[in-house]
Amino acid sequence: MVSSTTPSSGEYLLEMSGINKSFPGVKALDNVNLKVRPHSIHALMGENGAGKSTLLKCLFGIYQKDSGTILFQGKEIDFHSAKEALENGISMVHQELNLVLQRSVMDNMWLGRYPTKGMFVDQDKMYRETKAIFDELDIDIDPRARVGTLSVSQMQMIEIAKAFSYNAKIVIMDEPTSSLTEKEVNHLFTIIRKLKERGCGIVYISHKMEEIFQLCDEVTVLRDGQWIATEPLAGLTMDKIIAMMVGRSLNQRFPDKENKPGEVILEVRNLTSLRQPSIRDVSFDLHKGEILGIAGLVGAKRTDIVETLFGIREKSAGTITLHGKQINNHNANEAINHGFALVTEERRSTGIYAYLDIGFNSLISNIRNYKNKVGLLDNSRMKSDTQWVIDSMRVKTPGHRTQIGSLSGGNQQKVIIGRWLLTQPEILMLDEPTRGIDVGAKFEIYQLIAELAKKGKGIIIISSEMPELLGITDRILVMSNGLVSGIVDTKTTTQNEILRLASLHL
C-alpha cells in the first residue's frame, strides 16, 4: 500500500484515523484516514465503491464505525445523525439537493429553527439574517423567492449558505457541478473559496479531474476500502492520481480511433420540436460507423434533439430519413422498431429499476420478443441474453440475479447499453454516458462505444465534458439556444472554437 507522511495532530479541523467498517461478508473500510486542515479545500477521490460514501456515513453517524477515532477541532466525536453533525459544525451539500421546493428560500434556510417573536415566526428577522449571509457570500437570490422557481446552481448556493448559517467548520461537497454551466461553476468556486478564506475545511468529491486541480489544495485517495495516499495537489499529475485510484497506470484516457465512417444512414433536416422553447431547424447527417458528438451549454436543448428523434418529444416540422426512407417516430416503440436506441441522461431515475435484478434491467426494452408460441416467456433465452449482456459489456457482478442498484455507476451504465444492444439498433444515442462514473470505468465505456462504431453502428453522444467529446468523436454538432451553430471536425477543432459556437445565439 502506498502511503504519505502527514503532519502531526493539532493542524487539522477533522481527523479520521484508522477507520474500519465491515458488513456481512464485506470489509468496506480497512484502516482509512482522512485529515482536513482549516483554510483548505481537500479532494476525496476514488473509484465508485472505493469507500468514500461509507467513510462519510461513519462521520455523520449514519453508520457506526467498528473501530478508529474521529477528532473534530481536537475533540473526539461520535455523531448518531446528520442533524447532530450539522448542529456541531459539519455539513454536507449532497448531489441530490435536500430542499422543500414549495417553500421560500428563507424558510428552507431556517427550517426547524425559525427565529420567533412571541408565539410567531419573526419573518423580518429571518429575511434580514438570510440577506446578511447571502451578501457575505456574494449570493444574489431573493430570500422570499420560492425555491421551486430557482435553478439547480441557485439551490446549491442556498445549501452552502445554510451550512454557513450553522457556522459549519467542515463542509462536504458531493459532485456539486454535475448539472451546472461553466459560468455557474465559476460562481460556485468563488463561494467555495470564500468559505476557505473564512477558515472552513472543504471536502470536495468529484470525478472531474480538471476541477480538482483548479480548486483543491490536497487530495486523499481511497481504493477498495483502503487509504492509499494523502498528498498536496501541487506535487501530483493527473496520471499519478488516476494510477493511485485504479491501482495501475492508464496510459491513455481514450481508446484509439479505429472506426471508419461510411455512407450516410441518417439524415435530419430542419427538425423542430412542437413544445416551446425547443430545437429549431436542426439539420445534420450521421454516417455508418461514425461517432457524432453534440456539444452546448446547459439550456442549449441538446437532449431535445435525441428525445425528438426517439419519439419522446413531438416534432412540428422537419424530416427524419433512415437509409433513404423518410420515417416518423411518434413514440419510443416506433423508434425502437426503426432501429433507434436511447441511453438517457438520468441513469438512476429513468435508466434503471434500482431494486430489480440485472436480468430484468437487461431485458425490459425487448421483453415482448421473449414470448414463445403459447404466449409464455422463454426463460432459457432470457437467461442466455442476460448472460450475453454481462459477458459482452464486461459487467462486474456476482450474477444476473444481483440487484442492479448495488452495482457501481459504470457497471449500471454497461447493463443499460447492453439492454439496448439486444434490440439490435442501428442508431445508438447516449446522453451524458459517463456522468457520475469514475475514471477507470469511463475508459471501459469509451472502449465499448469505440467497438460499436467499428462494427458500423451510428452513434450520437451528448456530453458536457469537452475533453470527452474531443477524445472519442469524429465530428461535433454544436447547439446554442435550440439552434445548430456549427458542425466541426474533431481532428481540427479546438475547445475555444466549440465554446465560441456554443455562445453564438445567446
UniProtKB/Swiss-Prot annotation:
| Topology versus the membrane | Peripheral membrane protein
What is the top EC class of this enzyme, as a single word?
A: translocase
Which residues make up the binding site for ATP? G46, E47, N48, G49, A50, G51, K52, S53
The reaction(s) catalysed by this protein are: D-galactose(out) + ATP + H2O = D-galactose(in) + ADP + phosphate + H(+); methyl beta-D-galactoside(out) + ATP + H2O = methyl beta-D-galactoside(in) + ADP + phosphate + H(+)
Q: Where is this protein chiefly located?
A: membrane
Q: EC number(s) on record?
A: 7.5.2.11
Organism for this UniProt entry: Escherichia coli (strain K12)
Instruction: Using the record's annotation, list all stretches that form the ABC transporter domain.
Output: 14-249, 264-506
Q: Which InterPro entries match?
A: AAA+_ATPase, ABC_carbohydrate_import_ATPase, ABC_transporter-like_ATP-bd, ABC_transporter-like_CS, P-loop_NTPase
Q: What does this protein do?
A: Part of the ABC transporter complex MglABC involved in galactose/methyl galactoside import. Responsible for energy coupling to the transport system.
Recorded GO CC terms: ATP-binding cassette (ABC) transporter complex, substrate-binding subunit-containing; membrane; plasma membrane
Sorted alphabetically, the Gene Ontology BP terms of this entry are: DNA damage response; galactose transmembrane transport; methylgalactoside transport
Family in the record: Belongs to the ABC transporter superfamily. Galactose/methyl galactoside importer (TC 3.A.1.2.3) family.
Question: What is the name listed in the Swiss-Prot or TrEMBL entry for this protein?
Answer: Galactose/methyl galactoside import ATP-binding protein MglA
Assembly and partners are described as:
The complex is composed of one ATP-binding protein (MglA), two transmembrane proteins (MglC) and a solute-binding protein (MglB).
Q: Where does the record say this protein resides?
A: Cell inner membrane
Q: Which domain of life is it from?
A: Bacteria
The alphabetical list of record keywords is:
ATP-binding, Cell inner membrane, Cell membrane, Membrane, Nucleotide-binding, Repeat, Sugar transport, Translocase, Transport
Q: Name one GO molecular function term.
A: ATP binding
Q: Name one Pfam family in it.
A: ABC_tran
